[in-house]
């Protein structure tokens, strides 16, 4: 009799464990490929970045600034990841990407897309008061192969100069997320070029349906700012890279990773990571 009573408890306990799988997500500005980075060249940084990703075991993560050759280098070292995202200059492979990488043995790619942070989001274009560069947001719709749970993952890189562009980017991204994802679980990552006091950050964080993962944990591992400028800005506490989630997720941990090698940093940004769980 006792065994009969215990079996349903064990069964439902196993179901609960399976449906509550945690994911390690992250956002990481890789720093673009440029020969002017004397002492911090991509050829030296790439294997360190790959080792960092492997060690911290990111399941899904958004990248910023990566050129196609940089993303190819990461995938070559870490073939367990699949990459999705278009180049911001031509919608194919030219220019910086806001690419998303995910473990191909853990997730099935159901859909994906890109849109530009501009008044003409369907084609490569400058937005509002931005004068330097096209800005792009990439997204994927993933299904966890084991649990069958589905979620959307969006990743963006905001303009570094135009205040109007950053404000409007937040509006556009939230509109697109609502249109594409509806009430489904969503993770939004990116380099927002603004800390938690910026109005474009606040527009998302106070929206009522997307919350900063940092604010959802009791003990965030926040030991620095996220832009280190290859070491010349390490005393800053300003975090401009963020992870947002909808209420479908429980945030278990949040951390800013300050890994270094031989006294150097693998990028001019520190990656932000969060352990999250679909409710």
Which residues does each PLM region occupy?
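Structured beta-strand-rich core segments of catalytic domains in phosphoester-bond hydrolases
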Residues: 60-150, 255-256
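Sec-dependent N-terminal signal peptides
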Residues: 4-15
């Amino acid at each position: 009799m006792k065994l009969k009573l215990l079996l349903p408890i064990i069964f439902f306990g196993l179901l609960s464990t399976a449906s509550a799988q945690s994911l390690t997500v992250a956002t990481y500005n890789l720093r673009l490929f440029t020969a002017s980075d004397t002492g911090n060249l991509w050829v030296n940084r790439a294997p360190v970045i790959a080792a960092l990703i492997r060690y911290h075991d990111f399941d899904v993560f958004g990248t910023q600034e990566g050129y196609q050759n940089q993303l190819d280098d990461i995938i070559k070292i870490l073939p367990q990841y699949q990459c999705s995202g278009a180049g911001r200059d031509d919608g194919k492979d030219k220019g910086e990407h806001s690419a998303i990488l995910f473990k191909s043995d853990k997730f099935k790619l159901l859909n994906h897309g890109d849109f530009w942070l501009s008044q003409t989001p369907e084609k490569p274009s400058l937005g509002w008061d931005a004068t330097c560069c096209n800005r792009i947001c990439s997204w994927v719709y993933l299904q966890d192969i084991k649990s069958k749970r589905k979620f959307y993952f969006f990743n963006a890189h905001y303009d570094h100069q135009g205040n109007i562009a950053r404000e409007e980017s937040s509006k556009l991204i939230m509109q697109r997320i609502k249109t594409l994802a509806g009430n489904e679980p969503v993770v939004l990552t990116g380099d927002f070029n603004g800390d938690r006091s910026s109005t474009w950050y606040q527009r998302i964080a106070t929206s009522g349906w997307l919350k900063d993962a940092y604010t959802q944990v009791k003990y965030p591992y926040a030991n620095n700012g996220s832009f280190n400028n290859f070491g010349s800005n390490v005393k800053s506490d300003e975090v401009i890279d963020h992870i947002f989630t909808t209420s479908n997720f429980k945030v278990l941990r949040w951390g800013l990773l300050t890994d270094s090698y031989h006294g150097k940093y693998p990028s001019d940004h520190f990656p932000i990571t969060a352990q999250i769980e679909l409710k």
